[in-house]
């Protein structure tokens, strides 16, 4: 008997697949960082726009955005605060799942409150993309390039 048999075609293909999967897995932290930076930019710039022209922002929340249960001024303030604070957490990778989850819900509220205009302008597609990325970050976490990872290593049970 041959102690060192030649790998079959399936064995070689499986080996190549495992090699490729291992190489791609090394890109995961960069992909998650890219997602965090992209989403942070989108929401932070939106928050800056709200703050720069506050009277127009309140007018939009009065006339266009229909946020249930909140006055337009309160809704505008909470919206701006969310869009300016949560992206900072995402960039740092600090409380990332909380920040991504919060922005995920915020994104849904924006679509519901502004759906008619978004569908007319095609903007709903952007919100679907953002929601998908935020869902990935909420479920998968920020990746290894994050303050959360350092904190988990230091303070997680059994570390």
Model region roles, listed by residue range:
Residues 1-52, 69-81, 85, 92-159:
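Extended, low-polarity transmembrane helix blocks
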Residues 42-43, 56, 60:
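Residue-level detector of alpha-helical secondary structure
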């Amino acid at each position: 008997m041959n102690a060192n048999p030649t790998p079959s075609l399936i064995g070689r293909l499986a080996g190549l697949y495992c090699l490729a999967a291992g190489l791609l897995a090394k890109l995961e932290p960069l992909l998650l960082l890219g997602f965090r930076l992209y989403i942070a930019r989108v929401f932070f710039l939106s928050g800056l726009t709200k703050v720069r022209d506050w009277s127009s922002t309140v007018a939009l929340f009065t006339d266009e955005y229909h946020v249930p249960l909140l006055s337009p001024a309160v809704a505008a303030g909470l919206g701006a605060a969310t869009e300016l604070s949560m992206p900072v957490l995402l960039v740092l990778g600090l409380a990332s799942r909380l920040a991504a989850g919060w922005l995920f819900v915020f994104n849904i509220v924006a679509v519901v409150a502004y759906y008619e205009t978004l569908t007319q302008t095609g903007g709903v597609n952007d919100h679907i993309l953002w929601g998908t990325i935020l869902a990935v970050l909420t479920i998968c976490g920020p990746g290894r390039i994050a303050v959360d990872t350092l904190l988990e290593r230091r303070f997680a049970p059994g570390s």
